[in-house]
Amino acid sequence: EKSDKFDQLLLLIESGIKSIEQMNTIKTINKQLHDKNEELERAYLDTIGILRQTVEAKDPYTRGHSDRVSEYSVLIGKKLGLDEKTLHILKIGGLFHDIGKIGIPDSILLKESKLSDEEYSQIKNHPMIGVHMLGDAAIFTDILPIVKHHHERYDGRGYPSQLVGDDIPYVARIAAVADTFDAMTSKRSYRDSLPIDVVRAEIERCSGTQFDPNIAKVFLDIMDNDFDLIREIQEKYK
């Protein structure tokens, strides 16, 4: 009987050792898969990043735009107390929000005079072009709301979906403020950058119509009390 119990104990020990070995093997495989996935994600991000830079390289007046929008969005997100995952979405979403412009003809994208209605309609296609470009890649799922909806307006008069108020994804509402601020404070082929007091007044005026009023309020507070943070971003991505 003692011998039987001893044999059973040995079997249990052997079984336990095998289980541990199997668990270690599974952990190793999972780590290898995780590392490979990270490599693929980095490669994909690098590829799309090159496309993004290609878009900005076409127009010297918008160079650095996406980098600044990314950092302004994160700055707003931090002031709002958002979690790290959402801040990461804002960062990557800001970088790729205009990726769809790669599908817009240079003759329209670089035009120095006023756009015709037809040309403006084509420009308005860039969010959906971006969604089609990134939509099949799982790593971009979280940023698609920014790519698609950063031109929506709080009052429902934006594009492409004419969403109203809280129906607009929160991260897209943040990116909209960041995007507009950078557009107004950047020199363009058809105008100089706007004075900062004019920009501030415009954001305040559009609070509740173009912008989520709470997000606009937070950004106005940054402009009033932490403008050095904005200036650092502008200096970094001249």
Q: Where do the language-model regions lie?
A:
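Metal-dependent catalytic cores of enzymes that make or break cyclic nucleotides
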Residues: 38, 45, 49-238
